Each structure stands twice: as C-alpha cells, then as structure tokens.
Amino acid sequence: MSKVSPANIRSSVETILKGSEEKKRNFTETVELQIGLKNYDPQRDKRFSGTIKLPNVPRPNMSICILGDAHDLDRAKHGGVDAMSVDDLKKLNKNKKLVKKLAKKYDAFIASEVLIKQIPRLLGPGLSKAGKFPSPVSHSDDLYGKIIEVKSTIKFQLKKVLCLGVAVGHVDMAEEQLAANLSLAINFLVSLLKKGWQNIGSLVIKSTMGKPYRLY
C-alpha cells in the first residue's frame, strides 16, 4: 500500500510545474525524485539495484550512442543517431582515459546483439564502472523503439550513501504524464527495499532550478 496518495502526487506535480512556469528557464528542467533512506546499512545490507521503464520518457534530450555492426550502423545513420563501429572502438585501444571520456560523453549506449559479448574485450570495464554498459539490440528489433525504451528506463542504485536521486520527468510534460511516472517510480523503489516503506526516510520532488517539494 503506497503511503503517498495520488492526490498528494498530483498536488506536488502541480506545484513543481507551476513554479517552473512562473520562472521560465532557457532549457528544459529535469524533474528529479530525491530519496533519503533510513534503517539501512549500505555496508551490511544488500546494496540494491533495479531498473524500470516509465510510461513517459523522462529525459528526451538524453544522448545515446550505438555501438554497432554494419547493419545497425546503417540504421543509426538513417535515424541521425551517433554510432561507433568495432574499428572505432579498437582505436580507443582500451585506454582508460579515452573510455572514460566516451562514457562521459553519452548518457547511455546501445550495442548490436552480436557485439555485446565483445564490449568488455574491446573497451575493458570502463562502461560498466560508469553504470553505462550497453543495452542489446537485435536486427529484428525496431532501433527507434529501443532508443525510446532506453530513454524511458530509470535506474535505482544504492551506493555508499543513504540518498539517491533519479530523473522522473521534465517540466514540459503534462501533469498526468509526470504523475504517472512519479507514482510508478516510487512504488518500484519501495519494492526494492528490504523493509519497504520502513526504509524510506524522505521523498522529495524537485525541478533542476525549482524549490523542493516534500512528498513523504
């Protein structure tokens, strides 16, 4: 049972969107869910990690790069998406600095299914370390659909500190879209926690430049 009511979610979304409307920025603000955990010991308790696909793309401007074979390079080119071939990856020569730079340049990667097993051999552990190991795409998959799927997926990952933040939307979304993303994200997070709601200290929603709104 969610401890945050749909009405509370709606009023938080309304407040955030109204605030951004009053102070228009020259970029699209991201809306983030910030979570404070309690009764959790990251040293002893299992550090959870989970991904979920939201009904509406939270970050449409997310930059994506395709690591592809000839077929997928061609598809990427037609779709106007950045792409790299095996030869391009070999040129990085497993150089840690260059791989790190690549991981920084893009928000996410998609790789041809046939190449996915070669990625660690070609690049070393750099992309995994950055939490950006590529999602696989097969030739029968719709590449554009895959890109939307990757852009819609958010990841909750507990590291050493008891707070985390995830993008759940942006200020140009309709209220219903943002509310749907937010409630799904909260319920999924609670399902990852050992003691569910008992592990949640606070839930705050905030746009990039806006005031925080406490939900819980």
UniProtKB/Swiss-Prot annotation:
UniProt record similarity statement: Belongs to the universal ribosomal protein uL1 family.
A molecular-function term among this protein's GO annotations: structural constituent of ribosome
Organism of derivation: Schizosaccharomyces pombe (strain 972 / ATCC 24843)
Lineage of the organism: Eukaryota, Fungi, Dikarya, Ascomycota, Taphrinomycotina
Additional observations: There are 2 genes for uL1 in S.pombe.
InterPro entries: eL8/uL1-like (IPR050257), Ribosomal_uL1 (IPR002143), Ribosomal_uL1-like (IPR023674), Ribosomal_uL1/biogenesis (IPR028364), Ribosomal_uL1_3-a/b-sand (IPR016095), Ribosomal_uL1_CS (IPR023673)
Protein name: Large ribosomal subunit protein uL1A
Keywords for this protein: Cytoplasm, Phosphoprotein, Ribonucleoprotein, Ribosomal protein
Spans traversing the lipid bilayer: none
Modified sites of kind Phosphoserine: 85, 128
Biological processes per GO annotation: cytoplasmic translation
Purpose of the protein: Component of the ribosome, a large ribonucleoprotein complex responsible for the synthesis of proteins in the cell. The small ribosomal subunit (SSU) binds messenger RNAs (mRNAs) and translates the encoded message by selecting cognate aminoacyl-transfer RNA (tRNA) molecules. The large subunit (LSU) contains the ribosomal catalytic site termed the peptidyl transferase center (PTC), which catalyzes the formation of peptide bonds, thereby polymerizing the amino acids delivered by tRNAs into a polypeptide chain.
Coiled coil ranges: none
Highest taxon listed in the record's lineage: Eukaryota
Subcellular location: Cytoplasm
Oligomer status and interactors: Component of the large ribosomal subunit (LSU). Mature yeast ribosomes consist of a small (40S) and a large (60S) subunit. The 40S small subunit contains 1 molecule of ribosomal RNA (18S rRNA) and at least 33 different proteins. The large 60S subunit contains 3 rRNA molecules (25S, 5.8S and 5S rRNA) and at least 46 different proteins. uL1 forms part of the L1 stalk.
Main subcellular location of this protein, as a coarse class: cytoplasm
Keyword Amino-acid biosynthesis set for record: no
Disulfide bonds: none
GO cellular component entries: cytosol; cytosolic large ribosomal subunit
